[in-house]
From Swiss-Prot:
The chain crosses the membrane at residues 184-204. It is a single-pass membrane protein. The keyword Hydrolase does not apply. Contains a C-terminal transmembrane helix, three copies of tyrosine-based sorting motifs, and an NPxY eukaryotic motif, which binds phosphotyrosine-binding domains present on signaling and adapter eukaryotic proteins. The NPxY eukaryotic motif is essential for ER-mediated remodeling and lysosomal evasion by the LCV. GO terms for cellular component: extracellular region; host cell membrane; pathogen-containing vacuole membrane. It comes from Legionella pneumophila subsp. pneumophila (strain Philadelphia 1 / ATCC 33152 / DSM 7513). This is Effector protein MavE. A motif (NPxY eukaryotic motif) lies at residues 77-80. It comes from the Bacteria. Homotrimer.
Amino acid sequence: MTRFIMLSFVTGYRKSISCNRFSRNVVSPYFFMRTIIMTRFERNFLINSLMFLETILSVDKKLDDAIHHFTQGQYENPRYQINSRITNADDWSKEDKLKFTSAIAEAIALVSEKYENPTSETTEQIQSARNILLDNYVPLLTANTDPENRLKSVRENSSQIRKELIAKLKDEVPYKSQFENPYVLFPFVAATVAVAATAASVLFGNKP
């Protein structure tokens, strides 16, 4: 499951959705999130992807690396910006759109790469989870963002969405004791706990 495949997937779907129903005038956009039906695998995939997204957007070096990986140096190429999914994309600067797009692609790639030699069934599940994240959650992640600090708003939206996804996943798990270890169902996140802890110190600091 290579990063190249991931980039092809993201750029190939850039025109597939209209974000009008997630505009700033919509009341409580998280209502749509609660109505999205998904499997436990897909929910787990999203939780891990959002954790990576928050970390990448919180650490300058990781964001720079994400931009480099995603664009392969082609910083001005508009096909690398998933504008059709970003809420009120016309109001975003090119720089913010590029940063967000690179970060979300890197996050999905990092989670996808954890599945070594996936079966055809797993590949389909990964593809489905990616579709849900890009089609349904990117508009939510980018809704009601501060024009002066888009990425901070995205991180805050991501944190809220992730908490709701975790709460929903807990409801689906028959044995609550499994959650005594908060990372037991999210093994990919566990590998980034140290990085996330560092990122937390700058999450609401001077980071753009």
